[in-house]
């Protein structure tokens, strides 16, 4: 199929860009339909049910996916579980893995002269192949939720996927996934 052909032949930059755009449009349109079902028809995603089997407290839960869509994010938030995707902010969220881990603090407890941070229940979501909301703005990775599907940061199949995986934010997501 397509993946094998792209592994055997290096496509031009223009072809790769079109593949990314078409892939993002296809998945994005399907994702939009699912989101409508969640909002208007109370659709519960399978991952929402799956989350109920975990006791997500201070340490949270690590989830690693190669999917570009945001269905895991929707499932988590529908269950009241926050999502750490290593970006900080809400509308133009910057890629900031160091700062993102503190964004979920709920309390600072002092006991016996020692301080300990408490965190809201969260899922740390690692996407080593990218996400539909990821964009490069002024040379830096951002997560923009209401984005067009023109130039998303997603790694599609092909020879170049290994090279692309060493760029940010993919590299950090991959490295954290390897240690999770």
Annotate the PLM regions:
Residues 23-40, 75, 79-179:
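Active-site gating loop/helix substructures
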Residues 1-76, 81-83:
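Gly/serine-rich nucleotide phosphate-binding loop at the start of the catalytic core
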Residues 47-58, 115-118, 176-180:
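A short acidic-Thr-Gly-centered motif at the start of a beta-strand
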């Amino acid at each position: 199929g397509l993946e094998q052909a792209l592994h055997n032949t290096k496509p031009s930059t223009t072809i790769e860009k079109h593949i990314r755009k078409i892939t993002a449009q296809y998945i994005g349109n399907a994702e939009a339909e699912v989101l409508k079902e969640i909002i208007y028809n109370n659709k519960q995603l399978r991952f929402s049910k799956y989350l109920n089997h975990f006791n997500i407290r201070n340490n949270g839960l690590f989830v690693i996916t190669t999917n570009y869509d945001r269905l895991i994010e929707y499932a988590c938030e529908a269950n009241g579980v926050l999502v750490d995707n290593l970006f900080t902010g809400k509308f133009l969220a910057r890629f900031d893995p160091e700062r993102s881990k503190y964004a979920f603090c709920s309390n600072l407890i002092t006991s016996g002269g020692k301080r300990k941070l408490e965190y809201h229940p969260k899922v740390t979501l690692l996407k080593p192949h990218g996400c539909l909301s990821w964009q490069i703005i002024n040379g830096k990775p951002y997560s923009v939720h209401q984005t067009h599907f023109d130039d998303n940061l997603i790694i599609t199949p092909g020879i170049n996927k290994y090279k692309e995986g060493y760029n940010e934010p993919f590299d950090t997501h991959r490295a954290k996934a390897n240690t999770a």
